[in-house]
């Protein structure tokens, strides 16, 4: 959605009761209050960059949910007595704009930390900068493998399953169910796409090479459609289609496969399994798609009585009435902001960037309200893998049938 403003500021305070989904965790007790830039006796300032405009604007709702949640907390009380000022800036999924917005957050606004920013390419552009400044870059909406490098880039942590983990699991699934598969792949022409592609192909090679990739097609985020790529793939003889796309390209490609009458086994990257994306493609067109799952869906009968989904729905009705109940991207944003609030709660009166990082790396075992039962964060100070418990799932035309047992790479 086109946005006129790139900065919005909300002040918020939190009551501990609003974090009902959080696992118990001790507060940091300190003889003296300690602060980094962005924190004081009365305020905690956070930042974020997401595409509120441009080709990735579908994901701008992540920032809107963050605003709403902090506003709700503001109306309730306080995270250890402090208000939250949250600045979500528009980077239009552009690396140069992300650099500009991030520098503004750090150098002008002096935020304590950034959380929930989106996109492998934009976040790569500010990766070294934020680490050189010692500013936490947490719960990134990207699962690039580079974010798991606590030795060299300790200030950066992914918030999604790492893409290579997901790709390896899907490759093993293909080898198991179609050992002689002929695979066509459509992938985003950037680090995001390649982070899936290479480990997927490596698993096929390690399995003996009977299942093999016979055609690869790429697309750029600025491409108006992916129709020509899908036509090429459909004519290639491929009987498996690995769809490594995001946003509107995911919806377009699923719909185009159906229009072409092509009937491959379809694999879809987990970040594109939300109901808003599938609804745009047509649920009937998405039937049979296989994907990795780690999270619940909002707005579906299966989860309507789930306490976490009910918490999101309460927020949505009160603060985000224009957001659809089944917007899984918005629900993901809810899980992230609840987690960020938990990190701040654990910091107590030691609101330094070092302690924010310490509490984030200590989230092992914390269950985000977005996660499926049994899935928790697996972060440790030495391993920033966000989660290691994942599930294979198949879309049945209405909902996801999720495997009984978790899988790993």
Describe the residue ranges of each PLM region.
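N-terminal secretory signal peptides
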Residues: 1-29
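Immediate post-signal peptide segment of exported/extracytoplasmic ligand-binding proteins
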Residues: 30-45, 80-83, 175-180
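Beta-alpha junction/loop-to-helix N-cap segments that form part of ligand/metal-binding clefts
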Residues: 32-34, 58-64, 76-149, 159, ...
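Extracytoplasmic "Venus flytrap"
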Residues: 35-40, 47-66, 89-96, 118-119, ...
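Hydrophobic alpha-helical segments within soluble ligand-binding/sensing domains
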Residues: 98, 159-181, 225-227, 250, ...
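Extracytoplasmic ligand/sensor domains, especially the bilobed periplasmic-binding protein
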Residues: 110-216, 266-294
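Extracellular/periplasmic periplasmic-binding protein-like sensory domains
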Residues: 254-333, 402-408
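Segments of small-molecule ligand-sensing domains
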Residues: 318-331, 339-400
């Amino acid at each position: 959605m086109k946005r006129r403003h790139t900065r919005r500021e909300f002040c918020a305070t939190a009551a501990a009761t609003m974090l009902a989904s959080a696992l118990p965790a001790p507060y940091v007790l300190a003889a003296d209050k300690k602060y980094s830039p962005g924190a004081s006796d009365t305020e905690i300032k956070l930042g974020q960059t997401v595409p509120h405009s441009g080709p990735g604007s579908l994901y701008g709702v992540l920032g809107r949910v963050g605003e709403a949640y902090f506003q709700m907390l503001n109306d309730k009380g306080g995270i250890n007595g402090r208000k939250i000022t949250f600045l979500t800036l528009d980077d239009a999924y552009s690396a140069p704009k992300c650099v500009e917005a991030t520098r503004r957050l750090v150098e002008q606004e002096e935020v304590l930390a950034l959380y929930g920013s989106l996109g492998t390419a934009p976040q790569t552009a500010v990766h070294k900068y934020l680490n050189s400044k010692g500013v936490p870059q947490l719960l990134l909406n990207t699962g690039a493998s580079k974010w798991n490098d606590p030795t060299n880039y300790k200030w950066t942590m992914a918030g999604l399953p790492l893409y290579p983990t997901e790709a390896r699991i899907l490759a093993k699934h293909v080898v198991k169910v179609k050992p002689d598969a002929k695979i066509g792949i459509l992938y985003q022409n950037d680090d995001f796409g390649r982070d899936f592609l290479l480990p997927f192909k490596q698993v096929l090679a390690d399995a003996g090479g009977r299942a093999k990739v016979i055609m690869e097609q790429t697309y750029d985020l600025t491409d108006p459609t992916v129709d020509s790529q899908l036509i090429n793939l459909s004519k290639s003889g491929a009987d498996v289609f690995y769809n490594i796309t995001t946003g509107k390209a995911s919806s377009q490609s699923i719909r185009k496969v159906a229009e072409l009458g092509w009937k491959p086994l379809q694999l879809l990257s987990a970040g594109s399994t939300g109901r808003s994306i599938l609804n745009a493609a047509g649920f009937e067109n998405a039937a049979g798609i296989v994907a990795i799952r780690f999270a619940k869906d909002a707005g579906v009968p299966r989860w309507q009585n789930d306490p976490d989904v009910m918490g999101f729905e309460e927020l949505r009705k009160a603060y985000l009435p224009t957001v659809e109940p089944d917007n899984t991207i918005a629900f993901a944003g809810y899980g992230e902001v609840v987690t960020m609030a938990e990190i701040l709660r654990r910091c107590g009166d030691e609101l330094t960037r070092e302690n924010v990082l310490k509490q984030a790396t200590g989230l092992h075992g914390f269950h985000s309200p977005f996660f499926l039962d049994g899935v928790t964060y697996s972060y440790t100070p030495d391993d920033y893998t966000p989660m290691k418990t994942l599930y294979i799932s198949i879309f049945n035309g209405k909902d996801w049938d999720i495997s009984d047992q978790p899988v790993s790479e």
